[in-house]
Amino acid sequence: MASEVEDGVPVHEEFFLCGGVETQIIKCGPWTNLFDKQGVSKPKHLIFVIPGNPGLSPFYVPFAKALYSLVKGHFPVWIISHAGFCLTPKDKKILTAPQEPNAQEIEDIYGLNGQIEHKIAFLRAHVPKDVKLIFIGHSVGSYIALHVMNRAPELPVVHTFLLFPTIERMSESPNGKFATPFLCRFRYMLYAASYLIFKPCPEMIKSFIVQKVLEKMSFKSELRLTDLLQPFCLANAAYLGGQEMIHVVKRDDGIIKELLPKLTFYYGKTDGWCPVNYYEDMKRDFPEANLHLCEKGIPHAFVLGFSQEMAAMVADWINNRLPKK
């Protein structure tokens, strides 16, 4: 269903079955089906946003809208949910793509490896081969973006922007040291607590709680965010988080070296997930890399209050690299 937002940026929310699970896609721009030869002329590039964890797709809408406007509407901006991070509302249809080559389920789709395969499956099914891709990975979305490029080299990715990239030593980071015991040793207790508290909770109460939480964060959402309190989604976010602590350890220097001309890294100065020494190590090991260290005080969770600033930087990078059509 498409909705025209107040600032004139068309935003579409759709739900697809991808790899056997419900997947939310939020699309900024007039293009809803890139295979459709009728209507609006097909764009040459697609900006594809891969969120962090537990970054639900609607949190990225202000960023996507700002980015779409700043690239003058030349390229659509799509945000994909992680597998298991959304439940399709009763008033929405779950769509399928006739081009989808892999209707079979993806093994361990809620885990880190499965999330990578999930993104590959969607791109192969929903994006024509002649549409070039611009990836934006945030946090663990950066790790996923790198591995999508590595595993599916046929995808026409022209550039990837890795924002606050958690691509190494996650459990050793300041936040990781705190989170690892909860995500790896006590996650079943977290599952049980979320089910006991939120499973019997009426949707009206969940919506009220989410609304109050968003007000506290000064975040206005145009799309529903009650998945924040769905035990199914919380459990999958915790499971993925635990896998991140276990598997995102050694930096994949071989992949980075091979893809380096197509990569831009943006590190935070006060980031508890990828601290400054990770940036310094990257700068030492890859002196030719396109590396940036934040000078604007933008936090790791930039979608909470810094979407405009982040979109402005990414738009400048894109506008300086790509033709305007």
Curated annotation (Swiss-Prot):
It holds the Pfam family LIDHydrolase. GO terms for molecular function: sterol ester esterase activity. The keyword Hydrolase applies. InterPro entries: AB_hydrolase_fold, LDAH. It is an enzyme of class 3 (hydrolase). The active site is at S139, D271, H300. It comes from the Eukaryota. SUPFAM superfamilies: alpha/beta-Hydrolases. GO terms for cellular component: endoplasmic reticulum; lipid droplet. It catalyses: a cholesterol ester + H2O = cholesterol + a fatty acid + H(+). Belongs to the AB hydrolase superfamily. LDAH family. Probable serine lipid hydrolase associated with lipid droplets. Has low cholesterol esterase activity. Appears to lack triglyceride lipase activity. Involved in cholesterol and triglyceride homeostasis; stimulates cellular triglyceride accumulation and cellular cholesterol release. Acts antagonistically with PNPLA2/ATGL in regulation of cellular lipid stores. May regulate triglyceride accumulation indirectly through stimulation of PNPLA2/ATGL ubiquitination and proteasomal degradation. Promotes microtubule-dependent lipid droplet fusion. This is Lipid droplet-associated hydrolase. It comes from Rattus norvegicus (Rat).
